[in-house]
Amino acid sequence: MEKNIKFPVVDLSKLIGEERDQTMALINDACENWGFFEIVNHGLPHDLMDNAEKMTKEHYKISMEQKFNDMLKSKGLENLEREVEDVDWESTFYLRHLPQSNLYDIPDMSDEYRTAMKDFGKRLENLAEDLLDLLCENLGLEKGYLKKVFHGTKGPTFGTKVSNYPACPKPEMIKGLRAHTDAGGIILLFQDDKVTGLQLLKDGDWIDVPPLNHSIVINLGDQLEVITNGRYKSMMHRVVTQKEGNRMSIASFYNPGSDAEISPASSLACKETEYPSFVFDDYMKLYAGVKFQPKEPRFEAMKNANAVTELNPTAAVETF
């Protein structure tokens, strides 16, 4: 069942002025009850966003579209005669910003596109850190607490997944991206404002995340659920395919460093803490093989090294 209900939209400009308390309360409610919210007036230049969108769509047409069509042929997906549950209808590539950029290692990107994505990535990195401090304020944690936890000894990891979801002749047969929660910290999504597709699971119903011009969609990953001892939630979400239009998605993931030690914040923990303590890289190794499964068994498995192997026998695999 799909519903259209009021999705939380936060105007960050209202953090300055008499509406600050109300705005902070809206952010807190979204983190507790949605795991998602959308921000406007976030400080990112609109011309930079427009340019990134334009060049991403051009890059897909020039460098990615044929690869996507070849993938469909190789997997026998041109006709979609049956429901497909183990493949996503998406074209993607990844940019790594931190701890070391791979921006100049990606083939077929124009210099102009590289420059735009470098600028875009840096601004999103700064925005992510500002948002983490807002979460700290709402949680009663000292300013910088989440950034410090994410830092570990090597600094945070930060990367961007650039995706296109082409038109699909039979949307009922395949998802653009199967349902999952995100493993990491805080995710900042710049999505197409004309072609819909992103949905989140709330109270048993799939809810559309509305595409708003020049907005950024924020969602929380599993690590923030652990650190907040379940006060904030990572939520299942998916991308549904559409018969018309190519949906663009630029999702940037601000995650803990590989050796960051993750555990519930002491001020948020209680005697009956349900969430485990672990090293982020160990969680990612587990997540690699069970991404599209519920998060709760992952949390439980992290309490027991043997359970990790049982849940995902290939847990030694590295992932983005």
Swiss-Prot record:
Keywords: Ethylene biosynthesis, Fruit ripening, Iron, Metal-binding, Oxidoreductase, Vitamin C
Coiled-coil stretches: none
Cofactor: Fe cation
Domain of life of the organism encoding this protein: Eukaryota
Pathway field: Alkene biosynthesis; ethylene biosynthesis via S-adenosyl-L-methionine; ethylene from S-adenosyl-L-methionine: step 2/2
UniProt keyword Lipid metabolism present: no
InterPro entries noted in UniProt: DIOX_N, IPNS-like_FE2OG_OXY, IPNS-like_sf, Oxoglu/Fe-dep_dioxygenase_dom, Plant_2OG-oxidoreductases
UniProt enzyme class: oxidoreductase
Domain Fe2OG dioxygenase: from-to ranges: 156-256
GO BP term, example: ethylene biosynthetic process
Catalytic activity: 1-aminocyclopropane-1-carboxylate + L-ascorbate + O2 = ethene + L-dehydroascorbate + hydrogen cyanide + CO2 + 2 H2O
Family recorded in the similarity comment: Belongs to the iron/ascorbate-dependent oxidoreductase family.
Name of protein: 1-aminocyclopropane-1-carboxylate oxidase
Organism: Brassica juncea (Indian mustard)
